[in-house]
Amino acid sequence: MKKPIPRIGSRRNGRIGSRKNGRRIPKGVIHVQASFNNTIVTVTDVRGRVVSWCSAGTCGFRGTRRGTPFAAQTAATNAIRTVVDQGMQRAEVMIKGPGLGRDAALRAIRRSGVLLSFVRDVTPMPHNGCRPPKKRRV
């Protein structure tokens, strides 16, 4: 029986080089997605490849505590700690969503020692798109 020739870089034989190896990242983009239920902080390089991420849920907060400002602050601190060790000095911040953790995450990012180029609010706003859900009657 003929042996199959392994394709280089195929999904079956794994990735050739790990994306999360210790490369030096001088500049990056920090994405903060703050919903009412959770806060997700993702750190990418300039090309958009994910270097590090953390959410309030992965930090150990469960239930309604995930949406608190303290949980967002902890998630931002954990996500940035790894990239500061990899040498990130400058970053751009993109904040999305209406959650309570927006300001707390930004405060934690400012305290981390990374110089911020700019802070941009990228919350999606409809130009009167879909009909919103009906009002809650409690």
From Swiss-Prot:
Alphabetized PROSITE patterns for the sequence: RIBOSOMAL_S11
NCBIfam families: PRK05309.1, uS11_bact
Superkingdom of source: Eukaryota
PANTHER family noted in UniProt: 40S RIBOSOMAL PROTEIN S14/30S RIBOSOMAL PROTEIN S11
Pfam families for this protein: Ribosomal_S11
Listed GO biological process terms: translation
Subcellular location: Plastid, Chloroplast
Keyword Nucleotide-binding: no
Alphabetized InterPro entries for the sequence: Ribosomal_uS11, Ribosomal_uS11_bac-type, Ribosomal_uS11_CS, Ribosomal_uS11_sf
Protein name: Small ribosomal subunit protein uS11c
The species this protein was found in: Amborella trichopoda
GO terms for cellular component: chloroplast; ribonucleoprotein complex; ribosome
Family: Belongs to the universal ribosomal protein uS11 family.
Record keywords, A-Z: Chloroplast, Plastid, Ribonucleoprotein, Ribosomal protein, RNA-binding, rRNA-binding
Gene Ontology molecular functions: rRNA binding; structural constituent of ribosome
Region (Disordered): 1-23
HAMAP family in UniProt: Ribosomal_uS11 (MF_01310)
Complexes and interactors: Part of the 30S ribosomal subunit.
Lineage of source species: Eukaryota, Viridiplantae, Streptophyta, Embryophyta, Tracheophyta
